[in-house]
Amino acid sequence: MGDETIKVAILGSGNIGTDLMYKLLDCPASMELVLLAGIDPNSEGLARARALGVAASAQGIDAVLEHPDIQIVFDATSAKAHVRHAKLLRETGRTAIDLTPAARGPYVVPPVNLRQHLDAPNVNLITCGGQATIPLVYAVSRVTPVRYAEIVSTVASRSAGPGTRQNIDEFTFTTAHGLEVIGGAQQGKAIIILNPAEPPILMRNTVYALPEDDFDPAQVRDSIEAMVAEVQQYVPGYRLKNPPVFDMRDTPWGRKSAVTVLLEVEGAGHFLPTYAGNLDIMTASARRVGDVFARHLLSRREVAV
């Protein structure tokens, strides 16, 4: 593909890294995937990469560092590993897109604040619940100040691996913080539920926002619908279950009108099953961020020429 693309690599050959590989091969013309690196030589992800003609290595970060032309690295390993990776990638001048809870860079939600961080050396994608719900809280807060936002993400138990289960506390804290610093809520709260139902359910989210003052429901509804359309550009399975609901509630801050939104996310089925919308929205968001970063790097290259 030559000078018209940015060379990228994926760190982590598990479910997330493998699904992201399929997404990168399936879409943006701005990126060229040149390496999938893991640490398990027998992993299915590395075998699939080789079968698809993508260079694969079990040497982890060392394999990435051996390629001086790789400019963007997607890290789908673990928070502990990313702490080390972030330092090495920064020192070698590469942009890191972090899919772990490490948060060594600013939180990014593509339709909300991505453009503010185009030159950041490291960005973090928060959590699956954050990627699904923060856009909707922001859609409310850009119309009227939000005093409190609460989200409940329910995901299929089968889609939650050991990493998710070990990091439940981190999920709730990080997502709640994202509701505040990106979503615009004065106070945020997040809850995750692992549903063991068979057959597995799609990812479902309930978003509850309590505006500070009186507001125009039509403006809030229009803002939410516009935001859903934006997210659907890169997550086609992202959809409202019902129109937003507006009703009066007794709250710690007095009787106020509240906004409730019910949302589900169906995965694209590239590698992960379609019920794993919670994982799919992370890889889809990563692809979106990578595409925008790559186009930004290409535009700077053109200016330099």
UniProtKB/Swiss-Prot annotation:
GO terms for molecular function: acetaldehyde dehydrogenase (acetylating) activity; NAD binding. It comes from the Bacteria. This is Acetaldehyde dehydrogenase. Belongs to the acetaldehyde dehydrogenase family. The active site is at 128 (acyl-thioester intermediate). InterPro entries: Acetaldehyde_dehydrogenase, Acetylaldehyde_DH_C, NAD(P)-bd_dom_sf, Semialdehyde_DH_NAD-bd. NAD(+) binds at residues 13-16, 159-167, 278. GO terms for biological process: catabolic process. Pfam families: AcetDehyd-dimer (PF09290), Semialdhyde_dh (PF01118). HAMAP family: Ac_ald_DH_ac. Its EC number is 1.2.1.10. It is an enzyme of class 1 (oxidoreductase). It comes from Roseiflexus castenholzii (strain DSM 13941 / HLO8). Keywords: Aromatic hydrocarbons catabolism, NAD, Oxidoreductase. It catalyses: acetaldehyde + NAD(+) + CoA = acetyl-CoA + NADH + H(+). CDD domains: ALDH_C. The keyword NAD applies. SMART domains: Semialdhyde_dh (SM00859).
